[in-house]
């Protein structure tokens, strides 16, 4: 039996409102949609950064992806969505041992959020008086095994960025207060969006995103008309619009599931490894994270397309999104990093 794709957006009061805009109904923005799908196939890619103009569907695409994601198995009531009882943190009070299927967590990290809201809060008085580890889990606990979404991530406060960097590197959240220590797994796909006109992202956080995509407003009339038409139809009757696009959304979900099964079997021949290395050397990228992300993304694309091995075409397709945000700025090159990668790909991998 097929699981319905619809997922309702919670309102500020907690009430459920209309369903999210379907992923398959988003017009254009193919690079952005592909980058999000690749992280759904292989979360180990490391997340997606989407920078671009306002009103280009950045937030819509992220929330639409959430409705597509396959469910996960987790212990009922576990605050970190542990897959089995043995992995439940010792501080968590979980009354059930049942393993249930639940939606993949997608958690918003709002601007201006406090540190305790992100990492969780310790009740020191209760710990001292009763000897109990009283811990209120934060957003990182909720995001474990799912997605953490940051809109306008370039406006995040520095101390929150530092927290995210530490957790993204270790995969574990550690909260220490007055000699007490709490820890729990915090492995999630980081998805950030923002407008470059509002400020740059710190290089340390920028490098933690596996893929980076630039989105622009469509420049041709036909595309803009189609965007208007679909949005107007959705606003008039969201449920009917969702039903119309449900089959295509279900096709995409099935593609994700099938690609996940194929992924471990996709081979990376030596020619692909040499292509990765040659391209990164030509671009002058620092370290090896670029090559590793490039190869991993190409493998996910191959799995998504049903291929058995990574080919040059796969590498060329994902090179810009995997490498453009890792380049040093060249003040003499006015074309920008995206154009530099595209140009170098054509020269190095003809």
UniProtKB/Swiss-Prot annotation:
The keyword ATP-binding applies. ATP binds at residues 52-59. GO terms for molecular function: ATP binding; ATP hydrolysis activity; magnesium chelatase activity. It catalyses: protoporphyrin IX + Mg(2+) + ATP + H2O = Mg-protoporphyrin IX + ADP + phosphate + 3 H(+). GO terms for biological process: bacteriochlorophyll biosynthetic process; photosynthesis. PANTHER family: MAGNESIUM-CHELATASE SUBUNIT CHLI, MAGNESIUM-CHELATASE SUBUNIT CHLI-2, CHLOROPLASTIC. Involved in bacteriochlorophyll biosynthesis; introduces a magnesium ion into protoporphyrin IX to yield Mg-protoporphyrin IX. This is Magnesium-chelatase 38 kDa subunit. It comes from Rhodobacter capsulatus (strain ATCC BAA-309 / NBRC 16581 / SB1003).
């Amino acid at each position: 039996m097929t699981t319905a794709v619809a997922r309702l957006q919670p309102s500020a009061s907690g009430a459920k409102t209309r369903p999210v805009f379907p992923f398959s109904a988003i017009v254009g923005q193919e690079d952005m949609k592909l980058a999000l799908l690749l992280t759904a196939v292989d979360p180990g890619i490391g997340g997606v950064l989407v920078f671009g103009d306002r009103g280009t569907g950045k937030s819509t695409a992220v929330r639409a992806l959430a409705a597509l994601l396959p469910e996960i198995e987790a212990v009922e009531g576990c605050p970190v969505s542990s897959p089995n009882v043995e992995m439940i943190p010792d501080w968590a009070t979980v009354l059930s041992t049942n393993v249930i299927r639940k939606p993949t967590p997608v958690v918003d990290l709002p601007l201006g959020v406090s540190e305790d809201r992100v990492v969780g809060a310790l009740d020191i008085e209760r710990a001292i008086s009763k000897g109990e580890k009283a811990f209120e889990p934060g957003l990182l606990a909720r995001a474990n095994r799912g997605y953490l979404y940051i809109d306008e991530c370039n406006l995040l406060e520095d101390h929150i960025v530092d927290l995210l960097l530490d957790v993204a590197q270790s995969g574990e959240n550690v909260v220490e207060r007055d000699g007490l220590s709490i820890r729990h797994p915090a492995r999630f796909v980081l998805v950030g969006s923002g407008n470059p006109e509002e400020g740059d992202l710190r290089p340390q956080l920028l490098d933690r995103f596996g893929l980076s995509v630039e989105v622009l407003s469509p420049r041709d009339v036909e595309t803009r008309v189609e965007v208007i038409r679909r949005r107007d139809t959705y606003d008039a009757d969201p449920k009917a619009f969702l039903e119309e696009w449900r089959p295509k959304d279900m096709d995409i979900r099935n593609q994700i599931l099938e690609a996940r099964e194929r992924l471990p079997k996709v081979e990376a021949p030596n020619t692909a490894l040499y292509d990765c290395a040659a391209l990164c050397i030509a671009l002058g990228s620092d370290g090896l994270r670029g090559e590793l992300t490039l190869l991993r993304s190409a493998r996910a694309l191959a799995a998504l397309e049903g291929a058995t091995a990574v080919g040059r075409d796969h590498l060329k397709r994902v090179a810009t999104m995997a490498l453009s945000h890792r380049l040093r700025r060249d003040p003499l090159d006015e074309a920008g990093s995206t154009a530099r990668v595209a140009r170098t790909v054509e020269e190095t991998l003809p």
